[in-house]
Amino acid sequence: MRPNHSLSYQRYSVRFATHLLGSLLALFLCGTFAIAPLHGQRKAVFDLNKALQQFEQQVKKGVAITFTLTSQGSKPQEGYTWLYGRRFMLSMPGMEVAFDGSTLRIINQSERTYTLMTPSEQDLTAMNPLAYIQKPSQRFRITERKSPRGTVVYRFVPMQGTNVLAGVKYYEVTFDQQSQAPKRVDLYFDLGEQVSYTIHKIQPKEHITSQSFTFAPQEYKSLEVVDLR
């Protein structure tokens, strides 16, 4: 039986990951780019559908992203991820995550564990901080917010009764107005916590193979294996 875990983005541990299994909707890999009508949005040249589709095309070809995670009460943490269709690799201080399309693998150096699981869509979203950039459905109310010059900010609020983002009150995505590239993702939780991902660089990821989304035995040979499959 899995123990109860507290919600803690800043720890970036297996405890954090498993707590979020049922908390977040799998926006990363389900449905199409069916965008709900924008409520209260002024007429603008920025095309949200186009921006999301542009990011989707990058992911299909393979993309590498560097970012900084900030949350209340903790120091900023640098991280990077690369995405290739359904597969992804995520690296944060003390933690490495890999998904090869079927098995989710997590190396947690602070807890000295190597965890394997067959993930649900919620699991994948929980482990992929950039899932929120992609594929919101008609179950969201989307509004354009005031934003600094040169950027566009959209707020995504789950429709009442949908319960699509349990634990998350709403989230916001900031785009560069000229390039239409995502620049920042802010998550606002029901309990008042805010977690932000500031994207520094997005570039094509070359030389991706099936081995890019798994770990070599020497990387986890000294760790306790936790197989949840």
Where would I find each of the regions flagged by the language model?
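Short, hydrophobic/aromatic-rich segments at coil-to-beta transitions
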Residues: K60-T66, Y84-L90, R149-V157, S179-D186
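Flexible, surface-exposed loop/linker segments and immediately adjacent secondary-structure boundaries
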Residues: P119-G150
